[in-house]
Amino acid sequence: MRSILFAVLLLSALPVAFGTTDCPLFSVKQESNNSIIHLTGTNTAQSPILAYVVVAEIGRSRKTWKRVCNTGEELKPGMSIEIGTMNTGTESGVANVVVDYVRLADGTKWGPATTEEAKEIEARFKK
């Protein structure tokens, strides 16, 4: 039973383990205000961002944000966007934030795309 529990915990952490906040295309900044973490992303690429997936974990809490832009709504180079907020509850400290996927208007893609959200977006662009 312990082996199964360990496997479940390990598999649930894989997207965070394989992702990184060191994305050269989309910089994510987090700020804390009491028990709320605010995430802001900035397009650091030379091309507009069409889609992204960001995952944050703190303690046992995990949240995923995704965005796919319509034509004219792309995140232009240098622009920032509020990704979202996460209630940390009783946990304190900094969340582990991962950029799982980014897709640019020029066709460039970046990230391990380990979450279901990233896989769905990637499939959408292949059509």
Predicted segment positions?
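Short, solvent-exposed loop/turn segments enriched in Ser/Thr/Gly
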Residues: 31-38, 96
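Sec-dependent N-terminal signal peptides
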Residues: 3-14
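Detector for glycine-centered tight turns/loop "hinges" at secondary-structure junctions
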Residues: 46, 61-63, 78, 106-109
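Asparagine-centered strand-capping/turn motif at beta-strand->loop junctions
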Residues: 39-48
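Terminal connector regions
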Residues: 64-68, 84-127
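Boundary at the C-terminal end of the N-terminal hydrophobic targeting segment
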Residues: 17-19
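Short proline/glycine- and polar residue-rich coil/turn motifs
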Residues: 71-80
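Short, hydrophobic/aromatic beta-strand segments
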Residues: 47-55, 65-67
